[in-house]
């Protein structure tokens, strides 16, 4: 389940770099290609967690549009990043921010668990 718009390249690049200096992509979804990607470094996650991540990412991009990535910062904090093509007039910046805050509230326990998993990994 790869998509061609650069997320795979970004993911491969992040896994090659020193994780103490750069973010590591956990997963992402792209509304333009209608694809989802999970970093293979995290294939040991339980299937239920992987499925929840997929649903969350795809749901966001279907609702808001653009590209959503979940990334670990060097300190282990999990962040959500959203971007859109410059010519995507349907993408809603304000709606994206509101939806991200909603997801952060609703998925707080999942995010905390993933941060802990990443730190001990």
Regions found by a protein language model. Give the residues of each.
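Hydrophobic, Leu/Ile/Phe/Ala-enriched alpha-helical segments that form helix-helix packing faces
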Residues: 1, 15, 52-61, 115-121
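Negatively charged, low-complexity tracts enriched in Asp/Glu with abundant Ser/Thr
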Residues: 17-63
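Intrinsically disordered, low-complexity segments enriched in polar/charged residues with Gly/Pro
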Residues: 13, 55-58, 89, 96
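Amphipathic protein-protein interaction modules
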Residues: 62-118
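Secondary-structure transition/turn motif
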Residues: 12, 41-43, 82-88
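Short, positively charged and aromatic/hydrophobic N-terminal segments
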Residues: 1-19
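Intrinsic-disorder-associated interaction segments
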Residues: 4, 38, 42-49, 96, ...
